[in-house]
Amino acid sequence: MSIGILGKKLGMSQFFDDQGRAIPVTLIEAGPCRITQLKTSDIDGYAAVQIGFGDTREKLINKPSKGHLTKSGEVLLKHLREYRVEGLEGLELGAAITVGSFEAGQKVDVSGDTMGRGFSGYQKRHGFSRGPMSHGSKNHREPGSTGAGTTPGRIYPGKRMAGRYGGKKRTTRGLTILKVDSNRNLLVVKGSVPGKPGALLNIRPAKRVGSKPAQGGK
């Protein structure tokens, strides 16, 4: 199934395999999510499934969203995501999507917003080297030259300089699920994922495994 699931990053820990090796893992509280809309090719032009996740207060949901969510029997859902599918067989409006749709050993792609670090210098933001620290140098952490002189007489767009660092949507691909805990809605994923603890994550079956497209992935 190409439908993913929404979850919340709980933090990192370590997982011991059968050989006693410590493996860094991320704990994700995934779902349960509700199917809030089913889109069909006849009506919408393509087939897709929309799911909702996360509790919120009623006053934070506007009337159009409240009317949309009422159709599936759910009103207080904070986050909505859509997944394109080839067919809608076996899917029902209001049905729950849980971690049971994943299994240990499966490859997944995890998307989220990276940690925001505010306005940062070019060294922290881009990993540039610093200037000399002695021999009278005053250029310790300054950016240095940013372009030519009279021609072109400007700084080209995209020049790597100081600015806001982090807070970007990123995807970590090909992570392995080491354990699925259906009782606590937990996914134990090998490695790290974007975001800080509490961040919203989108977990989808991997589109590629190695150099080949994953079976059922698009």
Swiss-Prot record:
Keywords from the named record: Ribonucleoprotein, Ribosomal protein, RNA-binding, rRNA-binding
Source organism, top-level taxon: Bacteria
One Pfam family this sequence matches: Ribosomal_L3
Region feature (Disordered): 127-167
UniProt xrefs under InterPro entries: Ribosomal_uL3 (IPR000597), Ribosomal_uL3_bac/org-type (IPR019927), Ribosomal_uL3_CS (IPR019926), Transl_B-barrel_sf (IPR009000)
GO cellular component terms attached to this protein's record: cytosolic large ribosomal subunit
Record-linked Gene3D superfamilies: 3.30.160.810, Translation factors
One function term, GO molecular function aspect: structural constituent of ribosome
BP terms from Gene Ontology: translation
Function: One of the primary rRNA binding proteins, it binds directly near the 3'-end of the 23S rRNA, where it nucleates assembly of the 50S subunit.
Stored HAMAP family: Ribosomal_uL3_B
Subunit structure, interactors included: Part of the 50S ribosomal subunit. Forms a cluster with proteins L14 and L19.
Record-linked NCBIfam families: L3_bact
Family: Belongs to the universal ribosomal protein uL3 family.
PANTHER family the record matches: 50S RIBOSOMAL PROTEIN L3, LARGE RIBOSOMAL SUBUNIT PROTEIN UL3C
Protein name per Swiss-Prot or TrEMBL: Large ribosomal subunit protein uL3
Record organism: Prochlorococcus marinus (strain MIT 9303)
Lineage: Bacteria, Bacillati, Cyanobacteriota, Cyanophyceae, Synechococcales
Gene responsible for this protein: rplC
